Amino acid sequence: CIVANRGYYYIPHIVKKIEGQDSLDARFYERHYTMVEPKHFEPIVEGMWRGVNVGGTSTRARLDGWDVCGKTGTAENPRGRDHSTFLSFAPKDNPKIAISVYVENGGFGASAALPIASLLEEYYLTDTIRRPELLQYIKDMNIYYPAYDK
């Protein structure tokens, strides 16, 4: 979220329910700033945008009508398949959603975490699933990895 917002964040919280008018504590609306100047986030944001929209390992995260930014990652696992990671936010300017997905034993970032994150963003931003083939891909993934000896 800090990269998406170019240097600020809100205190994370979980809402169990909202009764009546908006009753969230005021501190959840307060921006907290890092010590990094916003201008330093621009090259990172641009790189994340290019990775999705120009070319790179994140192109599968493209979503028509939205400027999606993202970065795949692969965390090495000495005891089995690598872990799959994907960080993303959209739209590029004035983000509405930021997401991080980590799939243990999922392989490359683009293999497991990216499709999951992309589908969640798609549903959040459009209130529908436009890519049923991606949903089927996720359902068909075999990310189970049996227990290993210590």
Task: For the regions a language model picked out, list residue spans one by one.
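Active-site beta-strand/loop architecture of penicillin-binding DD-peptidases
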Residues: 1-32, 39, 48-130
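Short, highly charged C-terminal tails/helix-capping segments
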Residues: 131-150
